[in-house]
Amino acid sequence: MNGLITDLYQLTMANALFNKGRHERKVVFDRFYRKNPFNGGYTIVAGLEHLQQFVENFRFDEEDIDYLESLHIFYPAFLDYLKDFRFKGNIYAVPEGTVVFPGEPLLRFHGTTTEAMLLETGLSMIMNHESLIATKARRVRTVAPKDALMEFGLRRAQGHSAGLWGARAAMIGGFNGTSNVEAGKQFGIPVLGTMAHSWVMSFDEEIDAFREYVRQYHDNLILLADTYNVLEMGVPHAIQVFKELKEEGRLPGKYGIRIDSGDIAYLSQEATRMFTEAGFPDAIISGSNDLDEYTIQSLKAQGCTVTSWGVGTKIITADGTSALGGVFKMAVKEADGKEVPVMKFSNDVEKMTNPGIKTVYRFYKKDTGKMITDLVCLHDEKAADGGDFTLVTESAKWRRKELKAGTYTVEELLRPVVENGRNLPLPVLPEIIRYADKQMDTLWPEYTRLLNPDLMEINLSDKLQTLKSELIRRELGE
């Protein structure tokens, strides 16, 4: 992984701090975001496997150093320092697949000022991108809870890495497979596919294209039915081929057509009627063509009979929100050998940050398993132990949640993922997918609806609110 995957100002700041002898002072940074993507009610965390690879392999080779030297803005001693640079700090993060909300720390970074500056850009790039894709995928899964969802976006992805890691993120978000062969190999994702119009057009007759495909790929009987005319040619030809297979006793358990154009609601209903009348009521109708959660929800409301969806462009590009606004902010700095809590001040209250080394606790209703809320507190505070507990929202202190003893459970969300520069084991992808599904089950429906969802209020502990108030008063000279 190239050490140049960073912004220039990160390097120039590190260069200047090196010259002042302040480059190895200890710091703690938090990564969080301020607004849910897609005007939704939540975000799904993804990207930790990629993050670990990035951190482990972040270094500067000889060519990198030569290039930086050619810019004539870096001290020679600093460039020598970069030659042996390796991250040796600690990172805590919320597990992949976790449902999260604005304002709470999703990643806590312990390192030196140089480490934080050099790694910030890459860490943010990875987590912002993959969490965005996972969230978009989960929204699609929400409107099609029982259908097959296939990620078809590679050719529309904004680069190779976006296509590769986006496919993995889509799986965390609830998809069943991908057309991306490399993602299948690297991540063990089921690879799926049917045929393209070019296959059908390679034959003089559509039915000959179907017959030849069936002859060579007998177990993959999803025939593309819209090359010419879905209802007058595609479906009748598919029925004829299925009849031939049935007579030969070779009709597989799964068979059907894909529709990639036209009015999918109308065409799917007519195709289902035609298949049923011909004795093939179990024929699968697969749909594709610029689909997203809104289109699929609308098609279903119109009686669409598609049960298998190929979603490409709008999943891999996270259509609707161009980027997740995740930020990476200092919360603690070293001064005179001590850890000093710090915060960002701003005229915009929403951009003020929370100071200190923090962690996040999540509360669930004991009887239903549904989420109650999250609590951000200082890391050395004692967690709720199951007794009576009061939660107070910082922005609305009159709205208090009184939790009675024995009615709730609690878990800490931030877990160690890198320790002293070494990666710690992460769950494998199938485990992450199951965990992500369970996470969604903890959300009340009002947080998952596509339009105007309710927004989870994050609570700050009394101790954290007091620390924040003290720093604000100090800044104001009170």
PLM segments and residue spans:
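Structural motif
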Residues: 148-151, 190-193, 220-223, 255-256, ...
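Residue-level "edge-of-site" marker
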Residues: 197, 288, 312
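N-terminal, Lys/Arg-enriched amphipathic/low-complexity engagement segments
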Residues: 27-83
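Gly/Ser/Thr/Ala-enriched C-terminal appendages of enzymes
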Residues: 1-25, 39-40, 278, 283, ...
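Buried, small/hydrophobic-residue-enriched core segments of structured protein domains
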Residues: 1-28, 35-37, 73, 79-91, ...
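Short amphipathic alpha-helical segments
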Residues: 47-50, 132, 428, 432
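Short coil/turn segments at secondary-structure boundaries
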Residues: 66-67, 135-139, 153, 448-455
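Short, positively charged
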Residues: 71-79, 159, 388-397
